[in-house]
Amino acid sequence: MGIYMSQIVVCAMYKFVTLEDFEAMRQPLLDTMIKNNVKGTLLLANEGINGTVAGTRESIDNLLAYLKADPRLVDIDYKESYHQEMPFYRSKVKLKKEIVTLGIDEIDPNKICGKYVEPKDWNDLISDPETVLIDTRNEYEIEIGTFKNAINPHTENFREFPQYVDENLDPKKHKKVAMFCTGGIRCEKSTALLKAKGFDEVYHLKGGILKYLEEVPKEKSMWQGECFVFDSRVAVNHDLEKGNYDQCFACRMPITEDDKKRPEYVKGISCHHCYDKVTEKQKARFAEREKQSQLAAEKGFSHVGDEAKKLAQLNKQKKQQAKEAARKKAQQ
């Protein structure tokens, strides 16, 4: 496909593995990202590593080689897609208690989790009438795409998933449960939760939705809609190309071109999801940010990340030059 000729490689990765020295790993990893001009965010915790980054083919290969040099990460799970533009603005490595937040300390996928199902075998599993298929992602992600017949838990964040399980699932009644998420990390931790609660047959999609879209032909696919991603692309289609959604700056919800025509939508300030939830103070702040973004765009800069720093430095230099010119004029 043509997208493979694009310049930017977007790489989503994770691995549940005990990293007792995760704090010491942070700076060398960040230095490697910066050296190779890899942008995005990686999370480190005692339970493993997780994140999405982007860069040129060479820079991503260099980062993966660096990670795989650690025997604990030699088989790190990663999925790649492609984009014409850099979808991230900064290079960040954060230290966390969990690499994906469930909020239950005793749940450890390194000790127990469900059975991996390869993308090529996923259709057979979820077509089984005995299988309970659950989308472990958030409400706003599910709204724009999911698998046929998947259950929506209606959660706003992953921390709410344990409550959904307690209130809606029963190991005696639901004998066969299959779960999925964007890249595989949330559903892997979800299977650990269900196994801990006594569920027997628990399955999860290896590599998540992104791997399924990559490996399963569109004509055989049971995926419906687009897949939400946590970067400036907002969503990708079945070809892993940027989809038809943008994102509201105020609430981060995905929005369509039709949504932008609604009266509640004001670029950079509000949309129909949040117009009645955003305070006037917030709207004023968002309006100022949008103004600065427009000014930055006119100068050929982005308003965030490294380019914002360049713009700030440029403005500072201009002010200093103006002050110096005024001082010299006053001395004449």
Swiss-Prot record:
Residues 127-221 form the Rhodanese domain. Keywords: Oxidoreductase, tRNA processing. Residues 308-332 are annotated as: Disordered. One of its GO terms (molecular function) is oxidoreductase activity, acting on paired donors, with incorporation or reduction of molecular oxygen. It catalyses: uridine(34) in tRNA + AH2 + O2 = 5-hydroxyuridine(34) in tRNA + A + H2O. It comes from the Bacteria. Residues 321-332 have a biased composition (Basic and acidic residues). SUPFAM superfamilies: Rhodanese/Cell cycle control phosphatase. GO terms for biological process: tRNA modification. The active site is at C181. Disulfide bonds: none annotated. InterPro entries: Rhodanese-like_dom (IPR001763), Rhodanese-like_dom_sf (IPR036873), TrhO (IPR020936), TRHO_N (IPR040503). Its EC number is 1.14.-.-. The keyword Membrane does not apply. Pfam families: Rhodanese, UPF0176_N. Belongs to the TrhO family. HAMAP family: TrhO. Catalyzes oxygen-dependent 5-hydroxyuridine (ho5U) modification at position 34 in tRNAs. This is tRNA uridine(34) hydroxylase.
